[in-house]
Amino acid sequence: MTLQQKELFQKSPLLLENGETLSPVLVGYETYGTLSASRDNCILLEHALTGTAHAAKHFESDAPGWWDDYIGPGKTIDTDKYFLVCTNVFGGCSGTTGPSSINPKTGEPFRLQFPGFSIKDIIKVQRELLEQLGVTRIVSVIGGSMGGMQATEWAIDYADITDSIINIASPLAAGPDAIGYNLIMRMAILNDPDFNGGNYVGQPEGGLATARMVGMMTYRTSELFSKRFERFTVAESSPAAFSKEHFQIESYLQYQGDTFVERFDANSYLYLTKAIDLFDVTAPAKDDLPAFAKIKIPYLLIGITTDQLFRIHDLRRGYELLKEWDVPVTYHEVASEYGHDAFLVEKEVPKFEPLIRSFLSNLPVKSI
């Protein structure tokens, strides 16, 4: 079974955190394994900023997924045991309603008329989908990077049906480094003449590619770049040519930018990075307590010491805050030359897999 879609919020519109409403909402998702008769063996997997619902292959000739090494019979997320659901996030561009979707009121794409939204709104859509799928309990919500933010929000908003959380490389609030990088990336898009106020034809390729190049510099480490590229040059290149890549690192970044514009929408990039910036569960809720104080379920937090996007001191601070408020948190750190993206890299599976497998296997009996 590959990408499926469901239309939600047809009778009652989606009420967003900012008070705006939207109806209907189309959600793209993929599932792995079988929902049990008791409907309580679900694991919800959250993708990162530019990921998709295609987390793993469904058959041998299928396109690779972004977490193939963790998903399947006998693997960490054992599909003989669990029913795994992975959605394309609300506001994205891979099968779920977002800025590039058609506005039913105008017959034209929403573009920048799409309502602003938060991480909380993203998981509200997921909650509605799981209800439509018949899921009554979730064994664990697992996510890395922006996916970890979604997982954390699940522990706050829907702890009544969620048994545990696994958050990889995501703080309790976006730090100034991440906010600053996101601003630079958005400005690259907004200042591209082809952006045209969001009403572009095709893509604002230069701006979006530049944004991706900036992002790639935060997803990996200087150690990895030094080892892979040093100051190696591209054959037959001219050091005086500004329009051509002279160094191999330039060629690598240009390739990352060029391929990215073929698969991701610039407006979605603006909205999603802003949602990341605004994520902050340390802020007081209506009861004047920090939002994360509501978390009472087992919570696995994994920090990456070499992370250049979400710095390890922010993860450590998050762990201390969770402990102070008696959240049942387990914390581990992983070192990797791959930095923030380490949890997505096949070579690094042995560092993360035992931590995730052990956490899932040690959940209370009711959760498995």
UniProtKB/Swiss-Prot annotation:
The record lists the catalysed reaction(s) as: L-homoserine + acetyl-CoA = O-acetyl-L-homoserine + CoA
Example GO molecular function term?
A: homoserine O-acetyltransferase activity
Keyword check for NAD, yes or no.
no
Which residues of this protein are catalytic?
A: 145 (nucleophile), 307, 340
- rRNA-binding listed as a keyword: no
Residue numbers binding substrate = 212, 341
Per the UniProt entry, what is one GO biological process? Answer: homoserine metabolic process
Which EC number(s) does the record attach to this protein? 2.3.1.31
InterPro entries listed in its UniProt record: AB_hydrolase_1 (IPR000073), AB_hydrolase_fold (IPR029058), HAT_MetX-like (IPR008220)
Q: What class of enzyme is it?
A: transferase
Pathways involved: Amino-acid biosynthesis; L-methionine biosynthesis via de novo pathway; O-acetyl-L-homoserine from L-homoserine: step 1/1
Q: Which intervals hold domain AB hydrolase-1? A: 43-346
* Keywords assigned: Acyltransferase, Amino-acid biosynthesis, Cytoplasm, Methionine biosynthesis, Transferase
> Where is coiled-coil annotated?
none
Q: What superkingdom does the record give? A: Bacteria
Q: Name one GO cellular component term.
A: cytoplasm
Mainly resides where? cytoplasm
Write out the annotated subcellular location.
Cytoplasm
Q: What does this protein do?
A: Transfers an acetyl group from acetyl-CoA to L-homoserine, forming acetyl-L-homoserine.
Q: Quaternary arrangement and interactors, per the entry?
A: Homodimer.
* Family membership: Belongs to the AB hydrolase superfamily. MetX family.
Q: What is the protein named?
A: Homoserine O-acetyltransferase
Give the lineage.
Bacteria, Bacillati, Bacillota, Bacilli, Bacillales
